[in-house]
Curated annotation (Swiss-Prot):
Coarse class of the protein's main subcellular location: membrane
Taxonomic lineage of the native organism: Eukaryota, Metazoa, Chordata, Craniata, Vertebrata
Key words, A-Z: Disulfide bond, Glycoprotein, Immunoglobulin domain, Membrane, Repeat, Signal, Transmembrane, Transmembrane helix
Domain Ig-like V-type per the UniProt entry, residue ranges: 25-138
Residue span(s) of domain Ig-like C2-type: 145-234
Protein name in UniProt: V-set and immunoglobulin domain-containing protein 2
Expression sites (tissue/organ): Expressed in the stomach, colon and prostate.
Gene name linked to the record: Vsig2
Length: 328
């Protein structure tokens, strides 16, 4: 019976020695995520248990959604009895209790922005209490109403075709839900011809008819509010389009023929007004005689003719002279 008592006594003393030589830091944070509207103030609760000494240090850091804890960036830290805010949130981050040496290390973040959404780490170090790292995690979501969505349209908007209407907000937390509705008193599309996805914001319209034309509205909503956009859908009949195309082609053909006929008639009228060409002395043909040669030949011909006309008189005079000589 003595040995169990001795064993219990020894174990108690050993446990006390371990506890005194180094206590485990215990950090407590809320287990539920925190959601706060944009522009408001968030209080991120953090408490701890340890025997605060000269080596006590506290650090708050931030991790963006989807990134590992190793990618955290400091928000503020307390060491050597002084508080040091740092980073892009330095002017909006303070401690609710300063100095945080009484077991409370709550972080107060003012004027919340969408970029503040993420995970916040409350880290307490108090050497020689190294048995745990004293880390607590808090998830913060900054609530933002949906921004004005953008409506878009794609597909074949003719009779019998299909069209896809899109709707998307650039901002909104939590993510908005999208709902499409048709405005006016137009008949409701047949079941199955109008399918929408509330998550992606897409509306699929199949087997379009002329009655599918109209105004469609998309409403993006979350717990912070709603916003909407509208789109006008115009369904055309392909047969009417072909008839219109044929008519336009015929009209263009008639117009071109009219222009061609007008130009031809005008050309003929202008041609009749032009004077007829006459032959000029300066114009030479390939088989024509040079002007100088023709004039010389003409002069010789005239001279010969003149001699022929005078030849009888000359002959008589010669004969008379000859007769007189003989008489002498």
């Amino acid at each position: 019976m003595a040995w169990p008592l001795v064993g219990a006594f020894l174990c108690g003393h050993l446990l006390g020695f371990v506890c005194l030589s180094g206590l485990a830091v215990e950090v407590t944070v809320p287990t539920e995520p925190l959601s706060v509207p944009k522009g408001k103030t968030a209080e991120l609760s953090c408490s701890y248990k340890t025997s605060v000494g000269d080596n006590f240090a506290l650090e708050w850091s931030f991790v963006q959604p989807g990134k590992p804890i190793s990618a955290s960036v400091p928000v503020l830290y307390f060491t050597n009895g002084h508080l040091y805010p740092t980073g892009s949130k330095a002017d909006r981050a303070i401690l609710l209790h300063d100095p945080p040496t009484g077991g409370l290390a709550t972080l107060k973040l003012t004027d919340l922005r969408p970029s503040d959404t993420g995970t916040y780490l409350c880290n307490v170090n108090n050497p020689p209490d190294f048995y745990t790292n004293g880390l607590g995690l808090i998830n913060l979501t900054v609530l933002v109403p949906p921004s004005h969505p953008l409506c878009s349209q794609s597909g074949q908007t003719s009779v019998g075709g299909s069209a896809a209407l899109g709707c998307r907000s650039s901002e909104g937390a939590p993510k908005p839900v999208y709902n499409w509705e048709r405005l006016g008193s137009s008949p409701t599309p047949p079941p199955g011809s109008m399918v929408q996805d509330e998550v992606s914001g897409q509306l699929i319209l199949t087997n379009l008819s002329l009655t599918s034309s109209g105004t469609y509205r998309c409403v993006a909503s979350n717990q912070m509010g709603s916003a909407s956009c509208e789109l006008n859908l115009s369904v055309t009949d392909s047969s009417e389009g072909r008839v219109a195309g044929t008519l336009i082609g015929v009209l263009l053909g008639v117009l071109l023929l009219s222009v061609a006929a007008f130009c031809l008639i005008r050309f003929q009228k202008e041609r009749k007004k032009e004077p007829k060409e006459t032959y000029g002395g300066s114009d030479l043909r390939e088989d024509a005689t040079a002007p100088g040669v023709f004039e010389q030949a003409s002069m010789r011909a005239d001279h010969s003719k003149e001699l022929l006309e005078k030849s009888p008189c000359a002959s008589t005079m010669t004969t008379t002279k000859s007769k007189l000589s003989m008489v002498v």
